[in-house]
Amino acid sequence: MPVITLPDGSQRHYDHAVSPMDVALDIGPGLAKACIAGRVNGELVDACDLIENDAQLSIITAKDEEGLEIIRHSCAHLLGHAIKQLWPHTKMAIGPVIDNGFYYDVDLDRTLTQEDVEALEKRMHELAEKNYDVIKKKVSWHAARETFANRGESYKVSILDENIAHDDKPGLYFHEEYVDMCRGPHVPNMRFCHHFKLMKTAGAYWRGDSNNKMLQRIYGTAWADKKALNAYLQRLEEAAKRDHRKIGKQLDLYHMQEEAPGMVFWHNDGWTIFRELEVFVRSKLKEYQYQEVKGPFMMDRVLWEKTGHWDNYKDAMFTTSSENREYCIKPMNCPGHVQIFNQGLKSYRDLPLRMAEFGSCHRNEPSGSLHGLMRVRGFTQDDAHIFCTEEQIRDEVNGCIRLVYDMYSTFGFEKIVVKLSTRPEKRIGSDEMWDRAEADLAVALEENNIPFEYQLGEGAFYGPKIEFTLYDCLDRAWQCGTVQLDFSLPSRLSASYVGEDNERKVPVMIHRAILGSMERFIGILTEEFAGFFPTWLAPVQVVIMNITDSQSEYVNELTQKLSNAGIRVKADLRNEKIGFKIREHTLRRVPYMLVCGDKEVESGKVAVRTRRGKDLGSMDVNEVIEKLQQEIRSRSLKQLEE
């Protein structure tokens, strides 16, 4: 009979099989009421599943991350319950959990309108408020197939036929008259599923294959309580205000058009931001002793066959032909960097060799996945490749980590989650090589006092990697930085150096990206700052305005003086009211507005205002220039009044 060990080390002895709910009730009615599921020997199970042998048990509640995920999964089933009541002939496909919520793909003989979605959400609330029990039954494969075949659920039958072994026992979850199939676990009662909202609908092909039928995907969000739901909806509202596509149009940064899907047309102000980012990155490359190179954007298909990209990546590559040769427009920079490394004999004394490029890359992303600057087809990578010996890996990774944090801190990103992906089952190289490589990455992180979590088995077949995910002001995650070891590509492309023993050896290659795609990072920054770029990055840093025509000459003199001081400045001499000008440039998020009236001309000063509406009063021109230069030079995130 089972002995149940709880997280605090205490044990409970039973003379019969028990469920997590039984144990929770044994501990106390409060825990039983909060119990959503259990974790038995590390595996999530339903609250009703029986434990027959000795086991470690944790009770899962809505306060746990897993508990929230279960709530969201059960809300997907609730959606299925509601839609079958409203439109009984609907065929249900799949309804998984996603970040912050869930979705369900359905085959429906009508296109859902906003009114339909509102009616569906209303029915979901009506059902959830009944607080009915969710009943789980484990049945044979044949019984499950018969259940769904009798209900006309052809997609569920297809899942059973193609994805579930005949000797398996699928879990069926009954929501009153509605039944769904899932591995689980799910909530034991719908009282846990009161705080949700349906968000939008979209099209989705069955099994993600464009040859299959287009289904309707209904997205929803779900949370453990009303406060969390409202906070999330408020974040979404704020995110909509910060949408880089909207701000990009308002500030005239860039545009995109149908004739070039996923390609960016940079306007002057947007390109100014892009070039400032390049200047910043170049300054760091120099500080961390990188060479900057430039490879061709198109190379013969034969080279991509050697690297393995053609076999594994060709659908995402653009190709063209000339003189009976097929060329691939590069989706990444690494093969070109190996070609540069291969020019001339290399010695161990030449290593490490750090090679960086602002590489123009193209990937044939599906048109439906394109999203402003965040997901494009043509982009510029700020990546680099380090060629080194195995003994140099730790020091080089250390340098990469310092560079990552050095650059992210400049933009004010403080919350960074780090993951270390280890060896997969299918891999190249010896266990000893992987042992050392993984240890080098882990020690480098530890030496920099960086907490991290392992992603076991998630590394590439050619080496382990570190991923850096930064979180913005709305707590959204953006995976940008990577440090990836590669034991394969240098060998495939015949890279070598002469070792200390005079023998030819294959270098280790470290792929290093920090910003990732420059376009995407500008999109991230646009939303992070809501268009209020720090002064050093702002396309126009200062606008100087006159009140009447009599100050025009003074404004022009000051404009030239600030420009000569390296400040991006414009003069606004339009015959408009000063209040109108200030409002317009405030909406354009120009960091500083200098106003010149007769008093300023007489005193040789300027009246200084910020885009946040702060009046800094009258200041000496040279003082303004000196303070602005300091703010720009230091790449400060704060303005003068802060």
Curated annotation (Swiss-Prot):
Zn(2+) binds at residues 334, 385, 511. It is found in: Cytoplasm. The keyword Cell membrane does not apply. The keyword Acetylation applies. Its cofactor is Zn(2+). One of its GO terms (cellular component) is cytosol. It comes from the Bacteria. The modification N6-acetyllysine is found at residue 286. Residues 1-61 form the TGS domain. One of its GO terms (biological process) is threonyl-tRNA aminoacylation. Keywords: Acetylation, Aminoacyl-tRNA synthetase, ATP-binding, Cytoplasm, Ligase, Metal-binding, Nucleotide-binding, Protein biosynthesis, RNA-binding, tRNA-binding, Zinc. Binds 1 zinc ion per subunit. CDD domains: TGS_ThrRS, ThrRS_anticodon, ThrRS_core. GO terms for molecular function: ATP binding; metal ion binding; threonine-tRNA ligase activity; tRNA binding. It catalyses: tRNA(Thr) + L-threonine + ATP = L-threonyl-tRNA(Thr) + AMP + diphosphate + H(+). Its EC number is 6.1.1.3. Residues 243-534 are annotated as: Catalytic. SMART domains: tRNA_SAD. InterPro entries: aa-tRNA-synt_IIb, aa-tRNA-synth_II, aa-tRNA-synth_II/BPL/LPL, Anticodon-bd, Anticodon-bd_dom_sf, Beta-grasp_dom_sf, TGS, TGS-like. SUPFAM superfamilies: Class II aaRS ABD-related (SSF52954), Class II aaRS and biotin synthetases (SSF55681), TGS-like (SSF81271), ThrRS/AlaRS common domain (SSF55186). Catalyzes the attachment of threonine to tRNA(Thr) in a two-step reaction: L-threonine is first activated by ATP to form Thr-AMP and then transferred to the acceptor end of tRNA(Thr). Also edits incorrectly charged L-seryl-tRNA(Thr). Homodimer. NCBIfam families: thrS (TIGR00418). Belongs to the class-II aminoacyl-tRNA synthetase family. This is Threonine--tRNA ligase. It comes from Shigella boydii serotype 18 (strain CDC 3083-94 / BS512). The lineage of its organism: Bacteria, Pseudomonadati, Pseudomonadota, Gammaproteobacteria, Enterobacterales.
